[in-house]
């Protein structure tokens, strides 16, 4: 019954996300406020349905119900209660569910926070957020099903990965990282919506500043907690051991740090418009890249899950997001032209840009160093 409830909730959440995005887009393009109003209710429905799915999986983990394959693979009758609860994000399917839940929460907060405000922009931003959420929900209706049945049903489960039950930081480190990752979808969605609607040309950066700062703070906390944890486990080598997944967490942090500095220049001087849009797109794409590395299993890492079928799907999604973002920039290239030029050398704005360049050099260095083994393997 628990598994059936969870699966039904995920199906309804997917339908609500896809239907809401379609209603928002259709209503905005056709000028039909009733459709837009209907679509703006979708984020709350999606969050409610995904919350139901999370509650169903948590109930199965706490019981524990070994008829659910995820439960049988990640807890046992001897697993302490705390680690049964946090096993929700201890493996592939549960981590995707956590991501979808947090994303649904952010989307619902955006819908609530900006209800009735920026009517030309917010519906499009919500449509982008719902579309992103729909991808993760569809994964769970396919290759990453957290409610798949265990066949045959074992008498006891395998228990959580020993590396994950050695420290209580398992309870907070992954959620903070995920909050940082998911939070970066908000400035990305607003940047795309501002370009498409030709509104909030410079204001979108200010409107999303708190969301960006929150995502940066969550990501920073997650990285610091992970660094602390890495020194508690023999064989992990501490932080930073050039682990691909550690690199993948650092990449969006560097990109969003650069954006937080350069956004000030856009807000005050109406400069770096294209640069800031590119930084937001890059930061969001890097969160997807990090998720791909962790969940595809293509690189050896103490953090990575086993090889799964969702790796190619993530690559396709990353390619789709990149293509969509570039198309929007090309379509609205007049919107990202600067008004004037940067002031003289050694001005505050020029120093901010230099800071950005240094951070992006770090991004390029870490990224190339991370994917280099894949390139060598492909060539070989």
Regions found by a protein language model. Give the residues of each.
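Polytopic transmembrane helical bundles with strong interfacial aromatic enrichment
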Residues: 1-380
